[in-house]
Amino acid sequence: MTQNRVRTVFLLAHTGRPAAIRSAELVVKGLLRAGIGVRVLEAEARDLPLPGEVELVGEATPQCLDGCELLIVLGGDGTLLRGAEFARASGVPMLGVNLGRVGFLAEAERDDLDKVVDRVVNRAYEVEERMTVDVVVHRNGDIVHTDWALNEAAVQKAGAEKLLEVVLEIDGRPVTGFGCDGIVLSTPTGSTAYAFSAGGPVVWPEVEALLMVPISAHALFAKPLVTSPDSVLAVEVLPHVPPGVLWCDGRRTVELPPGARVEVRRGAVPVRLARLHHASFTDRLVAKFALPVSGWRGAPH
């Protein structure tokens, strides 16, 4: 007779936040009480009041999630994007609990922790896939860097003194060129992040598209562009101008020398997110940005 394998959840927390420490303690106790194993990074465990039953792993690699059914992330947007790196590399769904400000990637708030534990215990969640982008940097015809992003790849000026001089390209054809502070190349998920701050449109997650949003461009035609999800977007840094810098999800960066070319296309590997309820993205948008909807009556019945 084969023995049933113990269910295991990986917990990732921003241990610099007192709220994360308290939240982690509640989640761990609730899961262990239900007979679900919990795995935590050793470096984070030092800052958390964890019982001895918690499994500790020393190295932060995708393999540390082997055998886990879920990745629970406690923190703000930065911690959630860190969790997304683990989720993408391992294929394990991520369930985010927001301890920061907006937290569009999060599925629950700190006050919902009891519900989160209950839903995980009963497997009462669904998994959806979010589109990513793959990023390639070329220099003199050679590939010099590859990366990916869940929210956006941002090409920005490296210094404050001068504008970044670029030419934009879509599907192998030039579109326009100008001096700017940068260009945000975004997914629909990222449309409520940096692209939103740069004046880009909000795109519902179920809409498949790529966005190209200029940042403070010195040009008459500098509007946000929305393309097919199968388009290839490119930004070329002009030769003989100051260098730029590439940021992926605001976490990973590489310098872009003059003449560098950044290509962005639909990612081969999505990020899987665990969802606890069927709230529409419209309701999520209203709640996250505290949008005024008083006076709304709705369609007549």
UniProtKB/Swiss-Prot annotation:
EC number(s) stated in the UniProt entry for this protein: 2.7.1.23
Pfam families the record matches: NAD_kinase, NAD_kinase_C
Entry keyword annotation includes ATP-binding: yes
Active-site residue list: D77 (proton acceptor)
GO biological process terms on file: NAD metabolic process; NADP biosynthetic process
InterPro entries xrefs: ATP-NAD_kinase_N, ATP-NAD_kinase_PpnK-typ_C, NAD/diacylglycerol_kinase_sf, NADK
Keywords noted in UniProt: ATP-binding, Cytoplasm, Kinase, NAD, NADP, Nucleotide-binding, Transferase
Binding site for NAD(+): D77, G78, R82, N151, E152, K162, D181, T192, A193, Y194, A195, F196, S197
Co-factor requirement: a divalent metal cation
The reaction(s) this protein catalyses: NAD(+) + ATP = ADP + NADP(+) + H(+)
GO molecular function: ATP binding; metal ion binding; NAD binding; NAD+ kinase activity
Location relative to the cell: Cytoplasm
Top-rank lineage group of the source organism: Bacteria
The keyword Transmembrane is assigned to this record: no
Broad class of where this protein is predominantly found: cytoplasm
Any one cellular-component term (Gene Ontology): cytoplasm
Family per similarity comment: Belongs to the NAD kinase family.
Function: Involved in the regulation of the intracellular balance of NAD and NADP, and is a key enzyme in the biosynthesis of NADP. Catalyzes specifically the phosphorylation on 2'-hydroxyl of the adenosine moiety of NAD to yield NADP.
PANTHER family on file: NAD KINASE (PTHR20275:SF0)
HAMAP family named in the record: NAD_kinase (MF_00361)
Name assigned to this protein: NAD kinase 2
Organism encoding this protein: Streptomyces coelicolor (strain ATCC BAA-471 / A3(2) / M145)
The organism's taxonomic lineage, starting at the top: Bacteria, Bacillati, Actinomycetota, Actinomycetes, Kitasatosporales
